[in-house]
Design a protein with these regions (language model features):
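Conserved glycine-rich cofactor-binding loop
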Residues: 16-17
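Alpha-helical segment proximal to the catalytic Tyr-Lys
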Residues: 118, 162-166, 229
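Residue(s) in the substrate-gating loop at a strand-loop-helix junction
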Residues: 133
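Short C-terminal tail/terminal secondary-structure segment
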Residues: 2, 138, 221, 232-249
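Substrate-binding pocket helix/loop in short-chain dehydrogenase/reductase
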Residues: 89-90, 94-102, 201
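Active-site loop immediately N-terminal to the catalytic Tyr-X3-Lys motif
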Residues: 91, 138-144, 166-167, 208, ...
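Active-site helix of classical SDR
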Residues: 113, 149
Length: 249
């Protein structure tokens, strides 16, 4: 443990479980005051103050930041982690699914960021870190809707970094590979043989295992840290080499 984030205020969306929970814990354990925005409190209570928020609903986002303003007027770190998954090809996806996923993953991230900007401007070391995905840069089968949404997040990260660099607000993103999260666990549970399916999934990873949520959280914390004052517009892969390595079979 350290005090790297002592005195700083962080907001983490999707902090109830998975990567978001690991991010909230990391910030808390290293000195930050953390506010977790999510639909349900989940397991965040030891690490973050829970504020109900549905990032897919503009009214809910406004209400969440009104509640946040009762506790703090300054925000130092925003970790945009909340999102939803989707499987299937463009033939499989319905119009409703496209709109739902893009509304939450892309527009939701934009909603939260827009609500946070005025508070971030009051910080001496403001940072936004978006959770993207390897799906933004690698053609993954049966991930059309999800991949499109994460590709948009990557582009949004760069655009936001350009828009706010003169204000000193740094904007970066992480691209996790296949992470060991509740969402992946749910997908595996739907297989005929979940144990065999997990073993096969791990075997496809260059490191021979899935990326852990704390590993992604550490990368997010690195990008959010005031020590990285010259790092903005960066896309940091945390994928065990899945994107960049081509290993012999």
């Amino acid at each position: 443990m350290s005090e790297e984030f002592k005195g700083l205020v962080a907001v983490v969306t999707g902090a109830g479980s998975g990567i978001g929970l690991a991010v909230a814990q990391h910030f808390h354990d290293n000195g930050a005051k953390v506010y977790g925005l999510d639909l349900q409190e989940g397991s965040m209570s030891p690490y973050a103050h829970f504020i109900t928020c549905d990032i897919g609903n503009p009214t809910s986002v406004i209400a969440a930041f009104a509640e946040l303003a009762k506790h703090t007027q300054v925000l130092d770190i925003l970790a945009n982690n909340a999102g939803v998954g989707a499987t299937g090809t463009v033939e499989d996806a319905t119009e409703e699914e496209w709109l739902r996923v893009l509304n939450i993953n892309v527009v939701g991230t934009s909603r939260v960021s827009a609500a946070a900007i005025s508070m971030l401007r009051k910080s001496k070391s403001p940072a936004i870190v978006n959770t993207c995905s390897i799906a933004a840069t690698a053609g993954l089968p049966k991930r059309a809707v999800y991949s499109a949404s994460k590709g948009a997040i990557m582009s949004l990260t760069l655009a936001m970094a350009a828009d706010h660099v003169k204000e000193g607000i740094r904007v970066n993103c992480v691209n996790p590979g296949t992470a060991d999260t509740p969402w992946v666990a749910r997908l595996l549970s739907q297989a005929q043989d979940p144990v065999a399916e997990r073993a096969a999934l791990e075997a496809r990873q260059p490191l021979g295992r899935l990326v852990s949520a704390p590993e992604v959280a550490s990368a997010i914390a690195y990008l959010a840290s005031p020590r990285q004052a010259s790092t903005t517009g960066t896309i940091l892969a945390v994928d065990g080499g899945m994107q960049g390595l081509r290993l012999p079979k």
